[in-house]
């Protein structure tokens, strides 16, 4: 077997085991998907929380700094954090809607902290996210929770997105090590 083929097989196995590990976390703990990224990280017009003002004209650099700060906050709370690739429509159903691909974070409540969902909601507000994806233990009944003043889903509003479906692609999806997963109605 060539080295290239060996590496391809290893990477495929790594991708599958990473998706399996994600599924295992979903079965055993409450989980969430969140990011510090914003389409325009300097625009705080829809924010509800007091947060340091992001300044500058390099959005990618600002977003990377925001995600690093978010990772630090999540780890300090004792949560498991895995980098994933997210894809969704920011400002959904508005004139300013646009597809955004961003570095997102899959967060597992490894210590079953009873304040996990509230902590994720607070971090969503702090980082001025339109919403966070909250996933109850078992991977069923996941929902978006609005965490800023965007029209969709709206501050404090819940939008049911369904249950975990590994290996499937959709308009709104997440990838871990290149393997997609979605939440959808069954």
What is the predicted role of each segment?
Residues 20, 33-34, 114-117, 151:
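Active-site-proximal loop/helix of nucleotide/amide-processing enzymes and allied scaffolds
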Residues 82-86, 131-138:
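A generic structural motif
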